[in-house]
UniProtKB/Swiss-Prot annotation:
One of its GO terms (cellular component) is small ribosomal subunit. The keyword Manganese does not apply. Gene3D superfamilies: Ribosomal Protein S4 Delta 41, Chain A, domain 1 (1.10.1050.10), RNA-binding S4 domain (3.10.290.10). Pfam families: Ribosomal_S4, S4. Part of the 30S ribosomal subunit. Contacts protein S5. The interaction surface between S4 and S5 is involved in control of translational fidelity. This is Small ribosomal subunit protein uS4. Keywords: Ribonucleoprotein, Ribosomal protein, RNA-binding, rRNA-binding. One of the primary rRNA binding proteins, it binds directly to 16S rRNA where it nucleates assembly of the body of the 30S subunit. Belongs to the universal ribosomal protein uS4 family.
Length: 201
């Protein structure tokens, strides 16, 4: 599946949000790249909406075609479309692995999933976009549990808070999905209503 593989810090600076998490280069220069990066640009309504969509796409590592499908699904579901969209994005397996603290970044989580390190309800899943459901159980495979990424995750457990809709159990780092998240449990710096307005045109 296609994905963005360019310089993430540059993209973070362009969108004004840390897409990596703990990106020191972004923290030093949180303004757009280029000689005149600090210059103020008059924001049109469309530009603001488009930028918010791009922030969401690059935060979760989703290409445009797939992101639009997510929006269309969110729009069909009951409730607020923006809340539904974020819930869909949060339920991706790569994001759940990241949220559970088993990877430092979503990009790293995507790689771990793609390399086949996880099972969901006892079945191997190597598709990062796989959507988890309430009561799913995600395990690290036996042959992977003592590899370096998971040893590091055990050593750094607790450095980043785990959201209340997930639980990580024991040394084997089993992830329990107690529920899908409510909007208040999703801490991404997005104004999802701007995305809804963009696609509603």
């Amino acid at each position: 599946m296609a994905r963005y593989t360019g310089p993430v810090t540059r993209k973070s600076r362009r969108l004004g949000v840390d897409l990596v998490g703990g990106d020191q280069s972004f923290e030093k220069r949180p303004y757009p790249p280029g000689q005149h990066g600090r210059a103020r640009i008059k924001e049109s309504e469309y530009r603001t909406q488009l930028q918010e969509k791009q922030k969401a796409r690059f935060t979760y590592g989703v290409m445009e075609k797939q992101f639009r499908r997510y929006y269309e699904e969110a729009n069909r579901l009951p409730g607020k479309t923006g809340d539904n969209l974020l819930r869909i994005l949060e339920s991706r397996l790569d994001n759940v692995v990241y949220r559970a603290g088993l990877a430092r970044t979503r990009r790293m989580a995507r790689q771990l999933v793609s390399h086949g390190h996880f099972t969901v309800n006892g079945v191997k899943v190597d598709v990062p976009s796989y959507r988890v459901s309430q009561y799913d159980i995600i395990d690290v495979k036996d042959k992977s549990i003592n590899t370096l990424p998971f040893e590091v995750a055990r050593q750094t457990a607790g450095e980043r808070p785990i959201p209340g809709w997930l639980q990580v159990v024991g040394e084997r780092q089993r992830i329990l999905v107690h529920q899908l998240p409510e909007r208040a449990q999703i801490d991404v710096p997005l104004t999802e209503q701007l995305i809804v307005e963009l696609y509603s045109k």
